[in-house]
């Protein structure tokens, strides 16, 4: 087995829905383990919460407000000692829509 130039591949995943994020992480872990690479993680990172407060009406009733929030869930994982087969399998992997993936070699 030939190894890739780096010792690890760091993958950072972001999504609004944690269930979709966990499915994507499970697919990546299964793919990496099936090709003989080690996996460290997934490590749950702190969730970013963006809160927005708006008036319910246009003119009056300043006391009547509505709050919305947007949560961004994140996971971090390392693939240790990846082979060329691991990199090829990860490139062909189709993840669910709504998952943002950042890969650092």
Swiss-Prot record:
Which Gene Ontology terms of cellular component type are present?
ribonucleoprotein complex; ribosome
Q: This protein is called what?
A: Small ribosomal subunit protein uS10
Q: Which domain of life is it from?
A: Bacteria
SMART domains membership: Ribosomal_S10 (SM01403)
Please tell me whether the keyword Ribosomal protein is annotated for this protein.
yes
Which HAMAP family does the entry mention? Ribosomal_uS10
Which family is this protein grouped under?
A: Belongs to the universal ribosomal protein uS10 family.
Q: Taxonomic lineage per UniProt?
A: Bacteria, Pseudomonadati, Thermodesulfobacteriota, Desulfovibrionia, Desulfovibrionales
Which residue windows are coiled coil?
none
State the protein's purpose: Involved in the binding of tRNA to the ribosomes.
Please verify whether the record's keywords include Transit peptide.
no
**InterPro entries given in the database record:** Ribosomal_uS10, Ribosomal_uS10_CS, Ribosomal_uS10_dom, Ribosomal_uS10_dom_sf
Stored NCBIfam families = PRK00596.1, rpsJ_bact
How does this polypeptide assemble, per the annotation?
Part of the 30S ribosomal subunit.
Sorted alphabetically, which keywords does the UniProt record give? Ribonucleoprotein, Ribosomal protein
Q: Name one GO molecular function term.
A: structural constituent of ribosome
GO terms in the biological process aspect are: translation
Which gene is annotated as encoding this protein in its UniProt record?
rpsJ
SUPFAM superfamilies the record matches: Ribosomal protein S10
């Amino acid at each position: 087995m030939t190894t890739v130039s780096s010792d690890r591949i760091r993958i950072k995943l972001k999504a609004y829905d944690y269930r979709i994020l966990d499915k994507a992480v499970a697919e990546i872990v299964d793919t990496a383990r099936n090709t003989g690479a080690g996996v460290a993680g997934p490590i749950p990172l702190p969730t970013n919460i963006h809160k927005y407060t708006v008036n319910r009406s246009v003119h009056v009733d300043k006391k009547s407000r509505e709050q919305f929030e947007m949560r961004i869930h994140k996971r971090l994982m390392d693939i240790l000692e990846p082979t060329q087969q691991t990199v090829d399998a990860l490139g062909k992997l189709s993840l669910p829509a709504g998952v943002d993936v950042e890969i650092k070699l």
